[in-house]
Amino acid sequence: MKKFISNRFVLFFLGVIFVTLLWIVLSLSFDRNGAIFPSPLLTFQKFFELLGDSYTYACLAHTLARMGIGFGISFIFAFVLGILAGNHPSMYHFLKPLIVVLRSIPTVALVFLFVVLITPRDAPILIVTIICFPILFEGFVGGISNVDKQYIEAAQIDGASYFSRIAFVKLPLAMPYIVVAMVSSFALSFKIEIMAEAMTGYTRNGLGNVIAFAKGDAEDATPMVTVFAYALFAVLLMLIVSLIQELVTAWLKKKGLAIVNNN
């Protein structure tokens, strides 16, 4: 029984039940017709209705594609600069002020700034890139910096080159840090993309755009039901990402690699 309760997947499922019950309580506390805080029943009814609409998939694909571009750009920069900074502390200290600045800038300020500086249509991509880069960068740096020096010295004794030590020793051992950073930044980038789409108001066929439109739809008596239903797509996607993280983490642990944030 104790082993059953301590199982992470069982606890995850119990957590989902708790969140659902909390959702029901909050919806009953605020209103009963779904105009302000719709219940899970109303939300899922609308959710399944949206599942039958091809436009929903176009919006989801549009948002994921734009988010993927921003995430991919930030990953490339983080990969290159993170490896350099992880292997050369002087490079890390040189880039540290930039990382602090990027971490500190409010996302809303970036939205307003890039709407003015570049095409509003492309602003969400650049915002995702800037927000994700520091997280991914720290993941690469942290992973490489925490590799046991004994492995590096053993590779040097075997005659491994500088690039071979990075590719076949440091990066594999740094994977737990990198995976955690990737999952965290991916989840954040999805939320940022939706928010940026909603705030710019210029992107077509995006989840942020349809959420903003649903909120201001005067013909809809319960606009928040539609908003919650579209938001549910993001929640379910993040649950899938979390499951993938658990599977990858379990695989890394099976391979004998140290796991970070595994509680």
Label each region the model flagged.
Residues K3, S29-G72:
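Periplasmic/extracellular loop-to-transmembrane helix junction in inner-membrane transport proteins
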Residues G139-I178, L207:
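Short cytoplasmic-facing helical segments at TM-TM junctions of multi-pass membrane proteins
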Residues L126-I130, F163-M195:
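Transmembrane alpha-helices
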Residues L11, Y57, A61-G70, R103, ...:
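Alpha-helical transmembrane segments of multi-pass membrane proteins
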Residues I69-I99:
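Transmembrane-helix boundary motif in ABC transporter permease subunits
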Residues M1-I17, L239-N263:
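Transmembrane alpha-helical segments of polytopic membrane transport and secretion proteins
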